[in-house]
From Swiss-Prot:
May function as a transcriptional regulator that controls feoABC expression. One of its GO terms (molecular function) is iron-sulfur cluster binding. This is Probable [Fe-S]-dependent transcriptional repressor. The keyword Transcription applies. It comes from Yersinia enterocolitica serotype O:8 / biotype 1B (strain NCTC 13174 / 8081). Pfam families: FeoC. InterPro entries: FeoC, Tscrpt_reg_HTH_FeoC, WH-like_DNA-bd_sf, WH_DNA-bd_sf. Belongs to the FeoC family. Signal peptide: none annotated.
Length: 82
């Protein structure tokens, strides 16, 4: 099982990633990955970014029942510390 550090490192290596990508990459259950992402976000190590679905070819992702579950609208990346 991956640790918080391994999850953070996986995000760092890819630049940004969504929970599904990380779940598959680290062979971890999605609910566990989501909980770990929330923890890293609360710790200030990563940031949660909601993507705009306006780039969808049909423009209907926001109202499509399948789109709400299958279109990834949230990605995570390392937080810039200035």
């Amino acid at each position: 099982m991956a640790s918080l550090v391994q999850l953070r490192d996986a995000i760092a290596l890819s630049g940004s990633a969504d929970a599904n990508q990380l779940s598959h990459q680290l062979a971890m259950p999605l609910p566990l990955v989501e909980a770990m992402l929330e923890k890293l976000t609360a710790m200030g190590k990563i940031e949660r970014i909601e993507q705009d679905n306006s780039g969808c070819l049909t423009g209907s992702c926001k109202s499509c029942p399948e789109g709400k579950n299958q279109c990834s609208t949230v990605i995570y990346q390392l937080k810039n510390h200035r």
